Amino acid sequence: MIVADTNIITYFLLPSSCSDDLDALYKAEPDWAVPTLWRSEFRNVLALYLRKEIITLKQAVRLVENADSIVAHNEFTVSSAEVLTLVDQSSCSAYDCEFIALAHTLETQLVTQDKKVLREFPETAVSISDFFVHHN
């Protein structure tokens, strides 16, 4: 199991420069966990894409359904105390720290492309490419 941040889910479901790597990641590790916060973040991404007319409403609804199936039964609440402790120890947002807190709770890694998170939490956060370096 890995923790996947919202951008990883977005890049996996929408065409991106990371698409091939994320397909390989999902094949290697199909068990993706997320804090419940991911839903609001993902909806905000879809709202932006809708407003820029990159996707249609029908496509947005389908993307939510696909995302739901990826993380089915792997949504977790996280401790506010742990999130705030991580915020206090870093310059990351509380949103980002929710993903780190979940990775700590599940004793696994957070896969992210967020440079700040990768820099601030190198023991927990790993990029897509580094995931493959450590898991091959």
Model regions and ranges:
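Residues that scaffold the ATP/ADP-binding catalytic core of kinase and kinase-like folds
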Residues: 11-12, 45, 120-121
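Acidic catalytic patch
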Residues: 36-39, 59-90, 101
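Acidic, PIN/NYN-like endoribonuclease modules and their adjacent C-terminal/linker elements
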Residues: 1, 92, 100-136
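Contiguous, function-dense segments enriched for cysteine-driven chemistry
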Residues: 17-18, 62, 72-77, 111-119
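Short, well-structured N-terminal submotif of metal-dependent ribonuclease cores
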Residues: 1-37, 49-58, 135
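Entry/capping segment at the start of metal-dependent catalytic domains
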Residues: 42
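Alpha-helix capping/helix-boundary segments
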Residues: 8-9, 38, 99, 116-117
